[in-house]
Swiss-Prot record:
This is Envelope glycoprotein B. HAMAP family: HSV_GB. Glycans are attached at residues 151, 261, 441, 516, 633, 697. SUPFAM superfamilies: Viral glycoprotein ectodomain-like. Residues 183-189, 268-275 are annotated as: Involved in fusion and/or binding to host membrane. Belongs to the herpesviridae glycoprotein B family. Residues 60-797 are virion surface. The gene is gB. It is a single-pass type I membrane protein. Residues 1-59 form the signal peptide.
Length: 913
């Protein structure tokens, strides 16, 4: 080692530590990763270094710079005090320094720290552990003996699992929605006092003869309630066939048809209760589902049918469960349904089941159970599956693509004992044949005539079909030709021979056929070439398996030994041990036999290191770690010290007596910051140090990610129930929108209702009553129209304004007339001759100017004018009295007096004057 010492660094990302007094010792790493082998090697090197490393010199010599700059020529000037020369530097800008080697003295600390910071080297704040979270070292465990696999067989496999998914099929439900509404009719309003809704089934004959033949439905519903047969008519009218129209809205996977959008409500004469009936024929195509043991099925409407969907009248299906009377079920062969949207008949016939329940009729296509359902479901296909026989007498199936192994007995599974397991061989053969044609058709041959089925642990069923390479198959063929058995055993001989040699015959399988009646056929290999090839293959296989078994056992023993090292190191530096074990930055302290930990928080704000490590105001006292300031989560500037491995301490308690010839290197970011005599000098890059990493030159295996191997997906688990309640709620909320128009408002005209009632009354009187009714209805209609016109005119704002103005004008005229009459009564002369009376009033009247004779004449004239007015009134009364009936009576009386020779007397006496 050179006299100046050497700057040693541990592997990248490891926690450094220092050894020695005033001189600079070696910086050795503590474990950082969780890998047990790497941790053990690092700990062993650390213990050896601490025990055997000699002390180094005080000077740190690097490969890049020949000499260190003197204090005062670096970042801090001599003529500035320690407090004034605190140059805060930021350590977050990545990228190496652009300054050449040897010129670090001309750079400030800010530039050097920026050049050292990288993305991987971040700063952390570690709170002290409180003990709420503890970690224990795993105790030693007994190492298992890994059995070696032997007799490997390559092939293609298909994995099956238990089928938890329900059996789904399409079904049609037919029902008539009967709504009976009772309404109280008022003079200007209508109120619903009762509403009764019921679903009634559609007869099967109507479905087959009307709905599935002409796309129509009868507007009449006949059903049984309270053990009585009742009938309902749509709109209380005679039944007719109504076209089925598509529903307004449909949920996903469902369709619907109905006959009407409206609910009939009868609004009759005012003051009475009226009842109206609405019959809406509805056909819905829904999803039905049934779960094992398939003794009932549920519809997406929420209805449950208590019978097996596989119940039928042929092929033994009558043994399935049914919970209804036989008369409610009907099966129709060669049935041709129609598409209610296009009105097209199906091209192929089906066997359709019909079941009439108290509230609906359900129909679905029947098929045997064995063709529709299976108790096992295909899970995964393994194009490369390896089967090996373990020493405990079991088969181990390993799939590299799946990253999983399945262990089973050597005895094949008898699928006849598996209920509804006929699909396994069929689906497995189809999948294996497809994989073989796509991948192995030119390089391998299939062994056997069908897949071998095994029950693996965990309830999985493995359908395995061995593969033989073409070269090996040719060797088998040559051996058979040599023995003269090629024509006896046929093309399946290579697979049989390979199975007979490599694995014992499974229990319960049929014995091989006898040859010439002398015993069982036993095929052996006699070719030396084949034997050598087989021996070489078996030898290499056994050697590799034995080596892998030893490595596995040694790995387990190494884990137990590493536990002792971890336990001892946890007493020296629990934080480093916990960080390496957990794989994330934590702070730890021992609590007896366990470690209390707290997670370190990454500092995302700026981190600044100060140039001086001397304590201001205290001579002879210095800080043992550099001073830093940083920001964290917007809390402002925090003052602290730089801890080990980029840890930021929130206190400044680490002090020591100042010593001469002080030289220290501290980890900062991805490099090291160098202090001399407690002053910053420069930044030391990682490439300038000597690495203690011992590189192991090996070719590693390819990286492999282990992902969760889901047996049942979330969708499969959510779809296991008999009822899908979310779908039921969605359907119930959508029912009114599908089959009824909720936006349409029917406005009732009470006049029309009155005329309709009068018309119905006269129509009940026959033809004469109908004729009279037309006349009466015409007159009534005219009156209603006139009144309606007036009401409409008055309801118009302009009409109401005009009427108001006319009324106001009449009131003003009446007031003026009343005032004029009052003036006439009070002072007639003033009212008749206002000018004359006004002049007399202004000029005044002297007694000498009045002519008494003219005054008497004026009085006489006024008196005679009054007499003339009275005579005219009497004459007017007389004429009015003699007009009409009075005049007729006077005329008759005059005729009678004339016949009796009476003469009229003079009404005035000529001698009276």
């Amino acid at each position: 080692m050179p006299a100046g010492g050497g700057l040693w660094r541990g592997p990248r990302g490891h926690r450094p530590g220092h050894h020695g007094g005033a001189g600079l010792g070696r910086l050795w790493p503590a474990p950082h990763h969780a890998a047990a082998a790497r941790g053990a090697v690092a700990l062993a090197l650390l213990l050896l270094a601490l025990a055997a490393a000699p002390p180094c010199g005080a000077a740190a010599v690097t490969r890049a710079a020949s000499a260190s700059p003197t204090p005062g020529t670096g970042a801090t000037p001599n003529d500035v005090s320690a407090e004034a020369s605190l140059e805060e530097i930021e350590a977050f800008s990545p990228g190496p320094s652009e300054a050449p080697d040897g010129e670090y003295g001309d750079l400030d600390a800010r530039t050097a720290v920026r050049a050292a910071a990288t993305e991987r080297d971040r700063f952390y704040v570690c709170p002290p552990p409180s003990g709420s979270t503890v970690v224990r070292l795993e105790p030693e465990q007994a190492c298992p003996e890994y059995s070696q696999g032997r007799n490997f067989t390559e092939g293609i496999a298909v994995l099956f699992k238990e089928n938890i998914a329900p059996h789904k099929f399409k079904a049609h439900i037919y029902y008539k929605n009967v709504i009976v509404t009772t309404v109280w009719s008022g003079s200007t309003y209508a109120a619903i006092t009762n509403r009764f809704t019921d679903r009634v089934p559609v007869p099967v004959q109507e479905i087959t003869d009307v709905i599935d033949r002409r796309g129509k439905c009868v507007s009449k519903a006949e059903y049984v309630r309270n053990n009585h047969k009742v009938t309902a008519f749509d709109r209380d009218e005679n039944p007719v066939e109504v076209d089925l129209r598509p529903s307004r809205l449909n949920a996903l996977g469902t369709r619907g048809w109905h006959t009407t959008n409206d609910t009939y409500t009868k609004i009759g004469a005012a003051g009475f209760y009226h009842t109206g009936t609405s019959v809406n024929c509805i056909v819905e195509e829904v999803e039905a589902r049934s779960v094992y043991p398939y003794d009932s099925f549920a519809l997406s409407t929420g209805d449950i049918v208590y019978m097996s969907p596989f119940y039928g009248l042929r092929e033994g299906a009558h043994g399935e469960h049914i919970g209804y009377a036989p008369g409610r079920f009907q099966q129709v062969e060669h049935y041709y349904p129609i598409d209610l949207d296009s009105r097209l008949r199906a091209s192929e016939s089906v066997t359709r089941n019909f079941l009439r329940t108290p509230h609906f009729t359900v129909a679905w296509d029947w098929a045997p159970k064995t063709r529709r359902v299976c108790s096992l479901a295909k899970w995964r296909e393994a194009e490369e599956m390896t089967r090996d026989e373990t020493r405990d007498g079991s088969f181990r199936f390993t799939s590299r693509a799946l990253g999983a192994s399945f262990v089973s007995d050597v005895t094949q599974l008898d699928l006849q004992r598996v209920h509804l397991g006929d699909c396994v061989l069929r689906e497995a053969s189809e999948a294996i044949d497809a994989i073989y044609r796509r991948r192995y058709n030119s390089t391998h041959v299939l062994a056997g005539d069908r897949p071998e089925v095994y029950l693996a642990r965990g309830g999985f069923v493995v359908a395995f079909r061995p593969l033989i390479s073409n070269e090996l198959a040719q060797l088998y063929a040559r051996e058979l030709e040599r023995l003269g058995l090629a024509g006896v055993v046929g093309p399946a001989a290579p697979a049989a021979a390979r199975r007979a040699r490599r694995s014992p015959g499974p229990a319960g399988t049929p014995e091989p056929p006898a040859v010439n009646g002398t015993g069982h056929l036993r095929i052996t290999t006699g070719s030396a070439e084949f034997a050598r090839l087989q021996f070489t293959y078996d030898h290499i296989q056994a050697h590799v398996n034995d080596m892998l078994g030893r490595i596995a056992a040694a790995w387990c023993e190494l884990q137990n030994k590493d536990r002792t090292l971890w336990s001892e190191m946890s007493r020296l530096n629990p934080s480093a041990v916990a960080t390496a074990a957990l794989g994330q930055r934590v702070s730890a302290r021992m609590l007896g036999d366990v470690m209390a930990i707290s997670r370190c928080v990454e500092v995302r704000g700026g981190v600044y290191v100060q140039n001086s490590m001397r304590v201001p105001g205290e001579r002879g006292t210095c800080y043992s770690r550099p001073l830093v300031t940083f920001e964290h989560n917007g809390t402002g500037v925090i003052e602290g010290q730089l801890g080990d491995d980029n840890e930021l301490l929130i206190s400044r308690d680490l002090i020591e007596p100042c010593t001469g010839n002080h030289r220290r290197y501290f980890k900062l970011g991805s490099g090291y910051v160098y202090y001399e005599d407690y002053n910053y000098v420069r930044m030391v890059e990682v490439p300038e140090t000597i690495s203690t990493r011992v590189t192991l030159n090996l070719t590693l295996l390819e990286d492999r990610e282990f992902l969760p191997l889901e047996v049942y997906t979330r969708e499969e688990l959510a779809d296991t129930g008999l009822l899908d309640y979310s779908e039921i709620q969605r359907r119930n909320q959508l029912h009114a929108l599908k089959f009824y128009d909720i936006d349409r408002v029917v406005k009732v005209d009470h006049n029309v209702v009155l005329l309709r009632g009068i018309a119905n009354f006269f129509q009940g009187l026959g033809d004469v009553g109908a004729a009279v009714g037309k006349v009466v209805l015409g007159a009534t209609g005219a009156v209603i129209s006139a009144v309606g016109g007036m009401v409409s005119f008055l309801s118009n704002p302009f009409g109401a304004l005009a009427i108001g103005l006319l009324v106001l004008a009449g009131l003003v005229a009446a007031f003026l007339a009343y005032r004029h009459i009052s003036r006439l009564r009070r002072n007639p002369m003033k009212a008749l001759y206002p000018v004359t009376t006004k002049t007399l009033k202004e000029d005044g009247v002297d007694e000498g100017d009045v002519d008494e004779a003219k005054l008497d004449q004026a009085r006489d004239m006024i008196r005679y004018m009054s007499i003339v007015s009275a005579l005219e009134q009497q004459e007017h009364k007389a004429r009015k009295k003699n007009s009409g009936p009075a005049l007729l009576a006077s005329r008759v009386g005059a005729m009678a007096t004339r016949r009796r020779h009476y003469q009229r007397l003079e009404s005035e006496d000529p001698d009276a004057l």
